From Swiss-Prot:
Full protein name: Uracil-DNA glycosylase
Active-site residues from the entry: 61
Root EC class: hydrolase
InterPro entries in alphabetical order: UDG_fam1, Ura-DNA_Glyclase_AS, Uracil-DNA_glycosylase-like, Uracil-DNA_glycosylase-like_sf
Lineage, broadest ranks: Bacteria, Pseudomonadati, Pseudomonadota, Gammaproteobacteria, Pasteurellales
Organism field: Haemophilus influenzae (strain 86-028NP)
Gene designation per UniProt: ung
Gene Ontology terms for molecular function: uracil DNA N-glycosylase activity
Chemical reaction(s) catalysed: Hydrolyzes single-stranded DNA or mismatched double-stranded DNA and polynucleotides, releasing free uracil
Length: 219
């Protein structure tokens, strides 16, 4: 049984990774507000063990508003308003999954604990400045995460929404994993094919057909 340390532990010793950590540390030390809080940056890996991953949902960078980001892509803390992209994911779920009720919060830990890796491709952001940490080196790290999942695991489902996620997912072996693509669920693009994509039910059909327990998407 491999764990995250086995497959990506050495990345943390790489100069690029140390540089990313150092830049984030310096920004915080200089009084900048960086999201998520330091202890939550790697939450995606804490909530979903390597051997437990069944589904990978790729986000871009963390939410940059106060108290939103907590280290899981698309997820927000329970007391925070549900962001528009996640609201659209919930709307699709109400159409796609029989009996799904519109949740009152956007806290997706329940998904993560069932094996849904909610991975942002950039792990930090400065308050109010989307993509402000896009060039720190996080992309290289998350490319490695995708590569080790592709290589060491079988029959995963990758949900790639929007061109950024789809580009990141080009290395995935589609003969060994299910890759589902759609426009991003943001209000700008959801109507171009995210609504009606049925990715949540397709994910569960694939898991069940391969002898795995489906995801209970209800939050």
């Amino acid at each position: 049984m491999k764990n995250w340390t086995d497959v990506i532990g050495k990345e943390k010793e790489q100069p690029y990774f140390q540089h990313a950590l150092q830049q984030v540390h310096l920004a915080r030390a200089n009084g900048k507000t960086i999201y998520p809080p330091q202890e939550e940056v790697f939450n995606a890996f804490k909530y979903t063990a390597f051997e437990d991953v069944k589904v990978v949902i790729l986000g871009q960078d963390p939410y940059h508003g106060a108290n939103q980001a907590h280290g899981l892509a698309f997820s927000v803390k329970p007391e925070v308003a549900i962001p528009p992209s996640l609201l659209n994911m919930y709307k699709e779920l109400t159409q796609d999954i029989s009996g799904f009720q519109m949740p009152s919060n956007g806290y997706l830990v329940k998904w993560a604990e069932q094996g849904v890796l909610l991975l942002n491709t950039v792990l930090t952001v400065e308050r109010g400045m989307a993509h402000s940490h896009a060039n720190l080196g996080w992309e290289r790290f998350t490319d490695k995460v995708i590569a080790v999942l592709n290589e060491h695991r079988e029959k995963l489902v990758f949900l790639l929404w929007g061109s950024h996620a789809q580009k990141k997912g080009q290395i995935i072996d589609r003969t060994r994993h299910l890759v589902l693509t759609a426009p991003h669920p943001s209000p700008l693009s959801a109507h171009r094919g995210f609504f009606g994509c049925h990715h949540f039910s397709k994910t569960n059909s694939y898991l069940e057909s391969n002898g795995m327990k489906p995801i209970d998407w209800q939050i």
